[in-house]
Regions:
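An active-site-proximal "capping" alpha-helix that borders the catalytic cofactor pocket
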Residues: 192-206
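Pan-zinc metallopeptidase signature
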Residues: 213-312
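Non-catalytic architectural context of zinc metalloproteases
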Residues: 1-74
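Post-HEXXH active-site segment of zinc metalloproteases
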Residues: 157-194
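Active-site recognition of the HExxH zinc-binding catalytic motif
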Residues: 141-161, 195, 199
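Short pre-active-site segment immediately N-terminal to the catalytic Zn-binding motif
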Residues: 126-145
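Auxiliary, metal-adjacent structural segments of Zn-dependent hydrolase domains
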Residues: 62-122
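Short acidic alpha-helical/loop segments enriched in Asp/Glu that coordinate divalent cations
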Residues: 161-170, 202-228
Length: 312
């Protein structure tokens, strides 16, 4: 189901007291926005919450308004949702959310009370980098790419037919996904495959973009990760079945220190696991299809192609 929070956010911008209006907006959509803040920003109880709210509420939004005047983002989102429904044979409830965030993730996944959420934060998709909003300046044509990426996570986490480790951990947490808690309990193999599937699905739903855009890299980062692929693959040997938040952060996040990403004489590129994960699932996607692969266990996927070949 498509949920469009843009009208409510623009009501905040049109208010005479934007900060108070944002807090009302937060309360009106608390189950969704609290999960977004906890997973991608800061805890709402944190002393930094009010600072971030103030910055987001008072920021200029001319770039966003200009983009929305020329792009029908609702139709983009609906089309991506429909394509994913057909490709992935979706059989669980997934909310697709258009929203304006606070300059954190450009897109993301949540599970709230057992219901999956795939969201995009439109401040990042205006084609113009905006330091005031921390907007990345991505092309709005990339919205279907990122929505399909996140929708695939939603299927893997909540489909009745999913055999994924992520689904098991979310069920054990009473139907809630946490980047931090779920991440630290999940094996590195599952984390890599989870992101690799999302990359491959986004290629199928939104073809024609530069190769690096499917990973969230820039051209230079993509070249470096391809060059260092063998180093990254060797670093994974013996770690596939390990768990720990540090592994997720090392291979699948931005902003870790060089020391945290150091392997011998090398420093792993940020988010290098997306590239490796996409290679790990290529054979399964090609031979068994997207609908099977998105629900398959990591062991089933590894058995199709063989881990050694996928990460060589």
């Amino acid at each position: 189901m498509l949920i469009n929070l843009l009208p409510d956010f623009f009501a905040v911008l049109n208010s005479t007291d934007r900060i108070a209006a944002y807090l009302r907006y937060f309360d009106n959509h608390r189950s969704l926005l609290e999960a977004y803040w906890v997973n991608y920003v800061v805890e709402p109880e944190s002393p930094h919450f009010s600072e971030v709210v103030k910055s987001a509420a008072l920021a200029g939004r001319n770039d966003l308004r200009t983009m929305l005047e020329r792009m029908d983002v609702v139709t983009l989102a609906r089309n991506a949702e429909d394509q994913c429904r057909n490709l992935l044979e979706i059989d669980s409830d997934i909310d697709v959310v258009l929203m304006v965030g606070v300059g954190a993730a450009n897109a993301g996944e949540l599970v709230v009370n057992g219901r999956a959420v795939a969201f995009v934060c439109l401040e990042h998709f205006t084609s113009v980098a905006n330091p005031e909003t921390r907007g990345l300046g991505l092309d709005p044509e990339l919205i279907p790419l990122w929505l399909s990426h996140e929708i695939s996570h939603g299927v893997r986490y909540t489909s009745p037919g999913s055999r994924s480790e992520m689904k098991t951990h979310i069920q054990e947490a009473n139907g809630f996904y946490s980047y931090w808690e779920t991440g630290k309990r999940t094996t590195l193999r599952e984390l890599l495959i989870n992101e690799g599937i999302a990359v491959q699905v986004s290629r199928m739903i939104s073809p024609g973009h530069a190769s690096w855009e499917y990973y969230g890299y820039d051209r230079r980062e993509y070249a470096r990760i391809r060059e260092m692929g063998p180093v990254v693959a060797r670093s994974l040997i013996g770690n596939f079945d390990k768990t720990g938040l540090g592994l997720r952060l090392k291979y699948l996040s931005d902003g870790m220190s060089e020391d945290a990403r150091r392997i011998g004489d090398y420093v792993l590129p940020d988010r290098c696991g997306y590239y490796i994960g996409a290679r790990m699932v290529e054979q399964a996607m090609a031979t068994r299809g997207a609908a099977w692969t998105v629900r398959a266990s990591a062991a089933e996927i590894a058995a199709v192609s063989g881990e050694a070949a996928a990460t060589a």
